[in-house]
UniProtKB/Swiss-Prot annotation:
Lineage: Eukaryota, Viridiplantae, Streptophyta, Embryophyta, Tracheophyta
Name of the coding gene: petA
Quaternary data: The 4 large subunits of the cytochrome b6-f complex are cytochrome b6, subunit IV (17 kDa polypeptide, petD), cytochrome f and the Rieske protein, while the 4 small subunits are PetG, PetL, PetM and PetN. The complex functions as a dimer.
Signal sequence bounds: 1-35
Official protein name in the record: Cytochrome f
Family statement drawn from the similarity comment of this UniProt entry: Belongs to the cytochrome f family.
Domain of life: Eukaryota
């Protein structure tokens, strides 16, 4: 009877431990999968360095294009679209964290001038909401409302991202002026090659950490490899760990050099950055321009009428 109770207690504890482990795994995986923009937010006070380089390039090493489209000029307290395009071949698949192949995700950071910010929902038109879809934007910092981040989101659906932006009003914000301002954007497609702590992801090439002869290659049960290298200098064994994902390029007995690629480079994505300019236009200046154009048109009309009147007078004098 005592043995049966002991067995039941052990079984209950094992079931509870397994349940807790599963919950921790699910929570961790969810946090990691949704934390890519957070990497930059946690590590850098400002996503744009003094050199002009956007910090996302520290983890996404391949250079790819990105495009931004904004109006040439906007009026104060006006909602407008900033459209970011992140082009890539929709047919390609990327290496996922588990080593399997999957669709690419995309993300973007939009650095607006001081005073510009994400438009509130009640100011966004139905047409613009339809373009935005189910995207959820967030500020880079609570104190930096002019810097917006988005992602990772499915690339096949959101390779073109529409940001709803509200322009500032210098009448209420004294530090904002009617000027031409720069806008900076960074956009990535696919996973990065380096994590913020400096470690490699499985979405990059792995190189030999020693020169010598490959003495043994062990294929791990969950994917990846352990490559044993007999060091050329003293013969001691150096083991390089290859995670699931990259394809192996070497074989046992092969002589290799230091930093020689052991795997292919599975990365199909990359990061790009661009910029644009926008003018915060003074309404009074626009009104003055319209008044000037109207006066020029009226002057032209009066000139034509005066010319016709003069021609009539000349014609009548000739007939007389």
């Amino acid at each position: 009877m005592q043995n049966r109770n002991t067995f039941s207690w052990i079984k209950e504890q094992m079931t509870r431990s397994i349940s807790v482990s599963i919950m921790i795994y699910v929570i961790t995986r969810t946090a990691i999968s949704n934390a890519y923009p957070i990497f930059a937010q946690q590590g850098y006070e400002n996503p744009r360095e003094a050199t002009g380089r956007i910090v996302c390039a520290n983890c996404h090493l391949a250079n790819k294009p990105v495009d931004i489209e904004v109006p040439q000029a906007v009026l104060p307290d006006t909602v407008f679209e900033a459209v970011v395009r992140i082009p890539y071949d929709m047919q390609v698949k990327q290496v996922l964290a588990n080593g399997k192949k999957g669709a690419l995700n995309v993300g973007a950071v939009l650095i607006l001038p001081e005073g510009f910010e994400l438009a509130p929902p009640d100011r966004i038109s139905p047409e613009m909401k339809e373009k935005i879809g189910k995207l959820s934007f967030q500020s880079y910092r609570p104190t930096k409302k002019n810097i917006l981040v988005i992602g990772p989101v499915p690339g096949q659906k959101y390779s073109e991202i529409t940001f709803p932006i509200l322009s500032p009003d210098p009448a209420t914000k004294k530090d904002v002026h009617f000027l031409k301002y720069p806008i900076y954007v960074g956009g990535n497609r696919g996973r990065g090659q380096i994590y913020p702590d400096g470690s490699k992801s499985n979405n990059t090439v792995y190189n030999a950490t020693a020169a010598g002869i490959i003495s043994k290659i062990v294929r791990k049960e969950k994917g990846g490899y352990e490559i044993s290298i007999a060091d050329a200098s003293d013969g001691h064994q150096v083991v390089d760990i290859i995670p699931p994902g990259p394809e192996l390029l070497v074989s046992e007995g092969e002589s290799i050099k230091l930093d020689q690629p052991l795997t292919s480079n599975p990365n199909v994505g990359g990061f790009g950055q661009g910029d644009a300019e926008i003018v915060l236009q003074d309404p009074l200046r626009v009104q003055g321009l319209l008044f000037f154009l109207a006066s020029v048109i009226l002057a032209q009309i009066f000139l034509v009428l005066k010319k016709k009147q003069f021609e009539k007078v000349q014609l009548s004098e000739m007939n007389f």
